[in-house]
Amino acid sequence: MKDDIVIVSATRTPVGAFNGAFANLPAHELGKTAIRAALERAGVEGGRVSEVIMGQILTAGQGQNPARQASIAAGIPVESPAWGVNQLCGSGLRAVALGYQAILNGDSEIVVAGGQESMSMAPHCQHLRGGVKMGSFEMIDTMIKDGLWDAFNGYHMGTTAENVAKKWQITRKQQDEFAVASQNKTEAAMKAGKFKDEITPVTVKTRKGDVVVDTDEFPKAGVTLESISKLRPAFDKEGTVTAANASGINDGGAAVVLMKASEAARLGKTPLARIVSWAHAGVDPAIMGTGPIPASRAALKKAGWKKEDLDLVEANEAFAAQACAVNKDLGWDTSKVNVNGGAIALGHPIGASGTRVLVTLLYEMQKRNAKKGLATLCIGGGMGIAMCVER
């Protein structure tokens, strides 16, 4: 009999705005909070953890192995290894897939997998080992260079969204309508307390004392088509992608605890879901936002599912243009996609988002008694990743 790999707990921090509540918290502090809470929710002692795997993209100046820093700070003994993975925006979901594989192969028994990112703390830098003999020099923004800049074509991720909009014929109005729907769904979900179960509050030390952050900071209330249609294009003056129909620049952390179903039963834990399949795929870097199309198809094929079998989908909204293209190409029921809004409203802490979308999916599946779900993200450099889970 097959011993499934299951997710026994899942949680995330609130998503912080750029230079907002978490402006001075390094990524490993956000990761620490998520890891510790995930273990507490699972009822698992840190000493039982075989390894910790954390997605993170912006590691410049963050110290050796931020995943290890988060792991030890969360109370996991030094005997349990920890390491980081960088598959850009897919990192947090790839970390979960790697944990799944480690348990499946018998290399680990219990894995904490997740993602952590502080875009606010990404430093500016310059290579000065040879010195600057004369003249000025420019500081490089590592957040853009390492996280948001296409290395193959030499332009911003926003330009890839413009490419997708043209190729898939997604108009400015369609993008703005999608963005408004995302914001409005998130506003309604927050008023209904939909995210409270999945969020673990973060305590931030300030000069005036401790401040507890327990709510997503980025969503905007009362967004209308009229209010965002006035914005100018951000990447091409003749383009359609704006700050309002793109995801945010954000900080956050998320984590899940993985083990075999037999181990969960032994511990008396009811899993949130079992991992049925996962897949990643490559596309032209110039249209990286379409990566979820082949990745989702591959994950569904591995699972033996059809798109019609899906009860819920969480698809990361890097840009409205790519989200619309993914929906259009896959032809799935959009009423089941991002039912509480997505990254355009909630934000996109790049290395953590893969786990964030999975966590949000798992809790909404629980609320709706949904059976089959899929989480997917596009990935800079021309890739996509997807995972199928079942309750």
Residue ranges and their predicted role:
Residues 1-25, 224-290, 294, 359-360, ...:
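Condensing-enzyme catalytic core mediating Claisen C-C bond formation in acyl metabolism
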Residues 11-13, 24-28, 32, 41, ...:
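N-terminal extracellular/periplasmic Venus flytrap/periplasmic-binding protein-like
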Residues 23-111, 116-134, 199-214, 286-287, ...:
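Conserved beta-ketoacyl condensing-enzyme motif
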Residues 28-43, 66-70, 95-98, 157-164, ...:
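Short, well-ordered amphipathic alpha-helical segments that serve as non-catalytic structural scaffolds
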Residues 56-110, 140, 152-156, 222-248, ...:
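Conserved catalytic cysteine-centered active-site region
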Residues 87-117, 159, 165-194, 256-262, ...:
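Active-site-proximal alpha-helical scaffold in enzymes
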Residues 110-164:
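Flexible glycine-/small-residue-enriched beta->alpha junction loops
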Residues 160-162, 195-198, 205-206, 276-345:
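Active-site pocket-lining segment
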